[in-house]
Amino acid sequence: MNARALNLIGLGLVGVIGIAFLVLVPRFFELDVVLEFTVYMIMAILALSLALIWGYGGILCFGQSAFFGLGAYTYAIAMFNIGESTVPLLLAVIVPAAFAALLGYFMFYGRISDVYLGVITLTVTLILFNSINSTAGPEFHIGSARLGGFNGIPGIPPLNVPGNKRAPIDLEGMFYLATAALLATYFGLRLLLASRFGRIIVGIRENERRAELLGYDPRAYKLATFTIGGALAGFAGCLFANWGNFVSPTIFGLAQSAQIIIWVIVGGRGTLIGPIVGCIGIQWLTTALGANQPSGGSDWWAKIFANAPLIFGIILIAFVLLVPKGLVPTLGDIGQSLLASRGKEAKRLQPKRAEEG
Amino acid sequence: MRVNRRTFLQSTAAIAAAGMFSSSAWAEDPINVASIHDLSGGLDIYGKPMVDALTLAIEEANAAGGLLGRQVKLINYDTQSNMQLYTQFAQQAALKDKVAVVHGGITSASREVIRPVLDKFKTLYFYNTQYEGGVCDRNQFDTGVTPAQTVEKLVPHAMKKWGKKVYVVAADYNYGQITSQWVKKYVTENGGEVSSIDFFPLDVTNFGPTISKIQAAKPDFVWSALVGGAHISFYRQWAAAGMRKSIPMASTTFAVGNEHIVLSPDECNGMLICYNYFQDLKNPVNESFVASFHKRFGTDYPNITELAMGTYQGFRLWAEAVKKAGSVDRMKVIEALETGISIDAPSGKVTIDPPTHHCVLDVHIAEVADKKLKVLEDFAQQKPADTAAVCDLIKNPTDNQQYVIKI
Amino acid sequence: MDLAVLLAIQVLYAIASLALISVGLAIIFGMMRVINLAHGEFLMLGGYAAIVATSHGISIWIAMLVVAPIVVGLIGVVVERTIIRFLYGRMIDTMLATWGLSLFLVGLTTAIFGNTTVGISAPLGSFQIGAYRTSAYTLFVITVAAVVLAVIFVVMRWTRLGLIARGTMQNANMASALGVNPPRVYAITFGLGAALSGLAGAVLAPVSGVFPTIGVAYVAKSFITVIGGGAAILSGTVSASALFGSINQIATFVTTPVFGEVALLAAAIILIRLLPQGITGRFFRRGL
């Protein structure tokens, strides 16, 4: 068995599991589980957007939530003004992408790199947070949509079947849409990364100077990667606004930005499946920690077990120390060492790991 | 009915569950009641007392034999100051736990997240926090006070005491914006003048420049509608600048987050506030309530807050309606509540106002005095006049929105 | 005139508080390339240490200037020995670990202290400038910041510890080859950074209040200041604080706090665009 075959098997496996998930979940689970999975799928698309930018493009973006939030706000504002969802959906992808392109041009053509990129992107998302947060007054509106400040925009109308605004997509429909979108994003990114473009951006990540000397312009390639990532995050934001019919400035906040980075680290950088797994795992954990709290106990144990940040913090620290490479690469290593004990050729796979996943 | 795998699984699960419960002491399954509040993160200072009060109310109900002969079970969700979790937990409460009622939401933002979800899945909702007013939704009941109930009383009281020129500092969100408009309205109506209204995002901690601006304006008193942990630093910096002695302050947000305990007496004594409930209210219902609260949560419990009492009263009102309806069915309970149910609560008589689904209740003006709140003046049975100006659910039962009230 | 003096004091105060909250992070990041996302929580712990000490009858000055830095410094050393030392050279992983640490510390303080903690009020009273009154404590904060920065300068410039620290910072391998023990230097550095954060948290506690989640209000700002300052710890922190602090405060005074905040952030973006290595990447290169 060679690397290529292994890669194809992995790809096939993801496809089969994904489609099985898509078809079976609404049949076997109650609506509340379906709704919960819907938001996990949406967030997983967001995780993939950073997986591309950071994991493959090597651009440490601490403000992915800026594009996510812009997507959600754009959809909400456009929806209140237009009333039919096709154009708002497109805008929710185009506006964040354009914003990412502008910001990317500003950064990459200014030769800003490394941790400075992180700070600029973080700063941008905090500016958006502060600005949107201070739009509580009635004078802040775009067309008929009030921005609402801290309280955000509630009651966002859902997507409809393109062209027919009287046929909104229902809750199960949203699940199918989100899951299908996630699968499409995953396979789309796999294709992209297998293409010439994908090879070049990974090459730039590995050694920017060398890629430049070979005649590729790293700035342009980074800009393109960043813009694609911004568009994906905006698309996820649009779906998110649909799922909760709601958007508020906390979507731009520090906690949200850090969360996206954590998904990618936990799942494993340099893979695509990893951030999906990390995202769903962390989301599930956050929800589980908040659900079914013991109430009113004043003894120590109750205080500790009811303390979501305490437990979550311990889990994260333990995770970094015990699973340093992230979930999926570590599982991959375990799998390979199992394989290696059977056949020696598996060893040759090791250096190629960066391109798989 | 089309039988597919899901309904099949559901019904077998139901049979299994019924089998399990038949052996218990209770004739039927417990009645599920959901609590959705922030118990960690920045807003836990408000959420924890609310859940404690709800816990006590439910334990009292169970000790008295439950509701309709059934136990009441609290399902307690911690939203961790995260809006996304409000949506998720509201969905779970309605669909998975099939609760009879949801008590929850702290900020108006969280309420507007929960409200449509519970409307969609037909689950009764109680919002127990003081807020800006204007929500008109037959599925929702609001037990907190609105600006017309408190600001209207406190403005003339403070103006009589201190003078006519007012400087308003307010949290920069819906509640602060609307409350400051009400302040302006009542100050003008009472022949005074608002010299300026300044808004601060909820995470601002540096108030130096503002304090200088206030000094330049020389108002007779300052009205604070500041909210949350960060804004406590305003009172600190105000006192540190030596301003507390020369310019007094009034507020309808101070002390909800126990600010009067966090700050030293030197920093806030003499401040005027106005709410529905104070722990030191002198009436027999309240005295026995405070005693049992302290027995349950310890006598060192810092303070039973306005929001905690709102939650306690919210549950009691709902329980009263369930008794009257003889059922936990949503529509029957709503109809029972709409008969204008009332209870003798620790804060005095509390009655549901049928057209607005808000409450008619007593309000009190108090003064901060050495970490306590000393009640100065009582106003019996205040109507939610602001919401009533826009909302009539008896005439338009299908109305469903939050009005922006013209001030 | 009196207004101008008052404004000048407030601008100085903004600069001083920004420098105070950033300098601990600057040391940890500058020397060790560790992005400490639990930095805000170190500041928060400093505040709690001061509160607990004063409530046990210790004078407020000793509580703030001695107890808080020692307590938080020790916590820093423990954190370095138990978590950070496994993660050197893995900048990204330290981010995840310190984010976890930050949540953990917030949860722990909430469990221990609850969320209604009696704070400490600012000592020293107030004084009059023309028509205005302002807090004398403001001047104290400015003084503390100046003293802290001066001490760091002296230590870095003229002591053996400073020499070793600068050496390790410039080239850890070389320093190691010359007989320096990097793990020990790192533990001390991390402890010192934490201690300075504890000091800053305690000194600012009477102004900003103390509650478990206050760290969030600090961490982004200090991070931006440190990066904006660039590689040199001291001159970087000072110059970036001076720039951002005065922009923030003047904008706040002229317009609103929101605009002040946005002006600070926008200034940071423009600064990094113009000077991609931070201020000291271009100016004061030979500074500390």
In which residue ranges do the predicted regions lie?
Chain C
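Membrane-interfacial amphipathic/re-entrant helices at transmembrane-helix boundaries
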Residues: 1-20, 49, 58-65, 90-95, ...
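Membrane-embedded helix boundary and interhelical linker motif in transport proteins
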Residues: 9, 31-78
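Helix-loop-helix "hairpin" substructures at the membrane interface of multi-pass membrane proteins
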Residues: 14-15, 133-211, 234-239
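Alpha-helical transmembrane segments within multi-pass membrane transporters and channels
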Residues: 25, 58-102, 108, 239-244, ...
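Pore- or pathway-lining transmembrane helices of multi-pass membrane proteins that form conduits
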Residues: 41-45, 87-110, 215-227, 255-275
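Transmembrane alpha-helical segments in multi-pass inner-membrane proteins
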Residues: 59-70, 187-197, 201-202, 207-269
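Extracellular/periplasmic helix-loop junction at the C-terminal end of a transmembrane helix
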Residues: 99, 103-130, 253-260, 280-288
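Cytosolic-side transmembrane-helix boundaries in multi-pass membrane proteins
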Residues: 112, 170-184, 255-288
